[in-house]
Amino acid sequence: MGSKINPIGFRLGVNRDWEAKWYAARGYKETLNEDLRIRKFLDEKLKDASVSTVEIERAANRVNIAIHTARPGMVIGKGGAEVEALNKEINALTNKQVHINIVEIKKPDLEAKLVADGIARQLEARIAFRRASRQAAQRSMRAGAKGIKVQIAGRLNGADIARREWHTEGSVPLHTLRADIDYAWVNAFTTYGEIGVKVWINRGEILPGRKNQPAKRSKGGKK
């Protein structure tokens, strides 16, 4: 089953955390739809800002949003103008107090979402799919990845019949729960139709910390 299930959902609670952290006793549907509107708005507004992950936390009437991006300057803007504008627009969208935190991604070549976005943009620019996937995989391996797997599916090179092509380097153990596997899928819109890009990146193993050992009890009894 490790090969079929979403590897991020498979590892939730093990070495991955939820991207939305809130609890709603009532109005769950409205809160979830509000989350989806926020994510859709940020996807459209920051499509060129190399955003990998958006985390949303809620407390009372406050919404905390953490934007993980490889281009923090583009999101923040000159003197913080862009992030202030984002804050106001999301505030108007939700009617809640919004706080935005920008988190810089140090190694974008180890983020599956950014790698998949890069491959999709190259496919839309009519670059050969094998070249795009091979170069992306090589950059990820040079950045420190233990393994990477890329799947591209659709009418590749304008072929009449859609097919699926893979490129794999290193090791990507989908069944190993302690393996830090990042996963993303993106659609590329070409003149021949829609092409799907999926990327799995193995960033190594996350070993659980040792739990505190209980103090050893001394044996009772008289000497």
Swiss-Prot record:
It comes from the Bacteria. GO terms for biological process: translation. One of its GO terms (molecular function) is mRNA binding. The keyword Transmembrane helix does not apply. Residues 38-106 form the KH type-2 domain. Keywords: Ribonucleoprotein, Ribosomal protein, RNA-binding, rRNA-binding. Pfam families: KH_2 (PF07650), Ribosomal_S3_C (PF00189). The keyword Endoplasmic reticulum does not apply. GO terms for cellular component: cytosolic small ribosomal subunit. Binds the lower part of the 30S subunit head. Binds mRNA in the 70S ribosome, positioning it for translation. PANTHER family: 30S/40S RIBOSOMAL PROTEIN S3, SMALL RIBOSOMAL SUBUNIT PROTEIN US3C. Belongs to the universal ribosomal protein uS3 family. NCBIfam families: rpsC_bact. Part of the 30S ribosomal subunit. Forms a tight complex with proteins S10 and S14. This is Small ribosomal subunit protein uS3.
